[in-house]
Amino acid sequence: MKRILILLLAVFAGISAQGADAPKQRPNYDLASQFSAKRISQMVFSTELTPNWFRDSDKFWYAWKTPAGTQYWIVDPETGTRTQAFDMEKLAMEITAITRDPFDAQHLPIEGMKLKDDKYLRFDIKGTQEVPDTLAQKRAERAKKDGDKAPKGPQKPPMTKKVWHFQYELATGQLTEYKPEKREYPAWASISPDGETGVYVKNSNLYWMDRENLAKAVEDEKDSTLVEHRLTSDGIRQWGFGVDNYSGDTETDTTRRVMARGIVWSPDSKHFAAVKTDMRKIKDLWVINALSQPRPTLETYKYQMPGEPGPTEELYVFSMPDGSSKRYQVNAFKDQTFDVSTRPRKFRETYDKYRSRVWLGDNDGFWLVRGSRDLHRMDVCRVDLASDSTRTVVSERMNTYIEDRQIHLINGGKQFLWWSERNGWANLYLYNADGTLVRNLTEGAYHVEDILAVNEKEGYVLFSACGVNKDENPYQMHTWRVALAGGPIRQLDMDDMNVEATASDDGRWLVGNCSRVDYAPEAWLIGRDGKRKLLDKADLSLLFAAGYKMPERFKVKAADGITDLYGAMYKPFDFDSTRVYPIIDYVYPGPQVEANNIAWSKGMVRTDRLAQVGFIVITVGNRGGHPNRSKWYHNYGYGNLRDYGLEDQKYAIQQLAGKYDFIDGSRVGIHGHSGGGFMSTAAILKYPDFFKAAVSCAGNHDNRIYNRWWSETHHGVTEKVEQSDTTFVYHIETNPEIAANLKGHLMLVHGDIDNNVNPANTIRVVNALIRANKRFDLLILPGQRHGFGDMNEYFFYRLADYFSEWLLGDSERGEVDVKELNND
């Protein structure tokens, strides 16, 4: 033990001495500019395969783009064959002849590809020919009918580019034009399974139309002959059906027809369930759009903060066609949430003229999941229509928050599959419908992520899980099979890879998108027996030709010296092993995800690209950061949401700096967005002698004013029961409280109309820093929401400037023009 302590002291002493007299280093903006999001999009194309399954077979088609253009393929899993859907050269010539616009095989702008009757591929081509814009004309005519002011004098009809609609017969290769079918149903209607009825909301109340009138509404929603039937009359603004939870402008016009939130139908179309929501106690929040013309505008939206009164929800079931309704008592907890479970969507339903949301159950009742506000209690319930009863089938209880997944009914509804973390790991359980546990389908110290498919005929379940292979990165997802009768689980895909899989409706075939942070993406066909066939691989040749190098994986210990943490290191592509580089930690604390990339991604602006300026950039997990490990790991930060991940991040950097001579452990930066903005500011304030610079974007610095669900769920809320009433008390440490600790250099960044993390979060830190007499930097991005929109590229160079100045000792901050933006 004494020898280990001496070694650690020597390592950390060396870290402190490394950068004491570090010379100025010129930032490499030119290299960073070569890997902008725009330029990456010109070098890297398809990285993920999306199968478009046929309706009546296990075949599927997909598109794959490379520097040579886009190819369309049809895969027959049964025969293991992959054939080209088109002869692209021939197709381009045929389309050129018809449209009179020149195209070739590499430049054929196919849009909206869809399969028709498993026999035809339909798609659109936008040409250059100008034609009257009939849609714009109809809109103008409707506006005139509604009394809107029309321009005076003769008006030229609006024009648009002609869109050609083509149909390609797979069997013969014949190309023809086709006329698109008219829509039969308006987008705002929730359509019954038999297609005969559509339910919607108007004036906070429910209405319905029959099929004939729905078709008329598609043509003209304001047709005076439309016949609609009113189902409810007691709905009012913010207390009615179709009320949107937690978002939306409170000034929205309620007289128009809109989709009813939460409508789910019985399989026989004779009933539907609907949720009536009371949002009146939810307070308003605002952002001001300073760029609105001619005057700035106030945007108002509902926003519940931690500890505040919540919405209440009531469940009603309506009978059709008489429209009678009954309220069902499903409440067990104050301010509870509940969701009526729905039947899983099938890929073959993609080709239906409409999609119905059908409840999970039968014509006599359905299943729902309800949870207490603190999410310490969760129930799986069965609602029975005839007896007007709600029966609790499974109860989950835990001292931290409970998560869940979709219920899967099997055996004609007599049994179901349920996902639970009750033993500290996410596993699958088979239950009888009466709540009797039949067996654990999985029971290992690993994380089951989700069910991919159930094949009852052959008696197995396909699911995704990680952490089974103990010699791998525990975040790497794999595809597994287990028998419904129980037994060992079987891996279907390859080792040491992250596999995100999609299963066919019958679960006989999967398409797995496979990669690692240091391995180019591949797409594989995977059989239920584990046999595999490579379909395509991302072409990164242009990226490598530009000098790109893969990041490097690493493993370190958490601050407890026991828990393994996993990360990725991004070096400059012109890396010089004789140099010493500052290190920047790109962070997101979780708890729903970590910043650490497991799979390869072309979204590399804040990692690979930032490194090119002249830094070592890392991402690494921390205890409390990710749900795909043990429940202990995931919930480590419960009750300590500000500080829980900071010590691990600091200790990880110290270990890397002690191991690698090219890392200067005295020049440490930290950067993050949203939760990462919150974390990076907390880090420089909590460890002011370690972190020298931080750039914090859109941070929820004061979680007392961030959204109720995220804050209360991941930090915890105290229920107080007094005199038969329950209240909710929330307390959390915030960044403004420790602003006086600032010693390093901090830049705060926020979009001024961010309606996710309100700008007040950053303004409160600004106020605290000013009150503490601190110098800092603030960048407000006008007209930008949470993600910074079209100012992301500008922000990158401000990010590069800041870290260059304070970690490299040089930057372009003295220059007014961002010349790289002008040259991109």
Please tell me what each predicted stretch does.
Residues I15, D268, Q723-T726:
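Intrinsically disordered, low-complexity segments enriched in Ser/Pro/Gly/Ala and basic residues
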Residues Q18-E500, D506-P521, L525-I526, R813, ...:
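Beta-propeller folds
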Residues P51, D284, R355, N363, ...:
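Serine-hydrolase catalytic core recognition
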